[in-house]
Amino acid sequence: VLALGCHFSLEEIIEASHIFKSLPQTEGNLASIGYGKGALLALQAASLTDFAAIVAFDLTISDHTEVLLDTVPCPFFLQFGTKNHPENAVLVNKLKDLISRKDGSRVFAFEEGGKGFSIPFRDTYNKLTDGLAHTRSLELIRRVLGPYYDYAELFANHVYHEFITRDVEETMKTMIDDPYVNHVPTLSGGVGYDMLKRFYKYHFVDQNSGGRERIRVSYTLGPNRLVLENYTKFVHDSVIDRYFPGIAPTGKTVEIATVIIVKFRGDKVCHEHLYWDQGSALKQIGVLDAGDLPIAGPEAARKVLDENEPSNIFMQEAWAQSEGKPV
C-alpha cells in the first residue's frame, strides 16, 4: 500500500509505484491511500500505474473531478470528515449522486471527525473515527488485494486455548504483541501483553469450569472484525472474577446472552470487547433484588435462542392498552 500526502508530484507517484511494484517482496498489485491533494494525485495517477484500489481522504476537489472519477480504472473509496465542515457534508451528497460505477466504489462521511481526522499527531486526529475509516479502507483493500483470513477459525483456536487447553502461553500466541481485552460490564481484562497475560493466568483460565454450555447464535464477519452472539450457561460454583468480582460462589445457575466483538490485525487477535446483561446475571445469582425493575432473568438469554419465548413481559399493562388498535 502506497501512502501519499500533498508533497508529491504526479511523476513522483508514478515512479514510486513502479519501484514498489519491482521490489522482490511485493506480491500482487498495489493500492494507494491519499490525503487531500495526495488523494487527488493518486486518482490522477491511477491510469498510469498498477493501482488496483485507491482510498482517498478529504479529497481536494478540482473543476475536473467529475470527469476524473468516471475515468479512474480501479475501484476507490472517498472518505470525508464532516464534523464542523458542512461543506464536506454537501460535497459527499453531491459525489454520491455523481458516482454511478458498478465496481464497488463508494463515498463515506464521518460526522464524528473533521478534516484530517485520519492523520496521527495532528490536532485534528480522531482515534475513534480513524478506526472506523480504517475498517472501511480494509473493506476495499482486502476485497481487491487480500490477504484473506478465516476469522472464525482463528478465533476458535484462540478460544480453544482459553477454555480447553487453558494454556496461557498458547492463548497469547494467538494475539498481537500489544493486545487488550475488556469485559465491558465489569471492566475486567487487561491492556498490553503483560497485563493481559497476568489476567489470563490468575483470573481467567483456571476459572473456566468444565460444566459450561455455550451455543453460538450468530456471527458477523467484517474486513477486520468478527462479531459473535452466544448463549452461555454456567454454574457459579467457583470464583469467576470476570463475571462476579468480589462475590463468593453461590451455586446458582446463570444463563446469559453475550456479544463478543473481536478485532484482528493480520491473522492475530488484536482486541476483544465482551458484553452481557450484568443486571440479569446478578439477579440470577441472588445478589440483586430487582423488585419491580424491568430486569430479566434467564428468560432473556432463552429468548435469544427462541424468538417465540414470551415478549413484552415487563410492559404487560402498556401492551394491553394497544390491544385491538389498528396497525
Briefly describe each language-model feature range.
Residues 2-25, 30, 135:
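Alpha/beta-hydrolase active-site loop
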Residues 29-43, 47-66, 77-89, 94-327:
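C-terminal and inter-domain tail/linker signature
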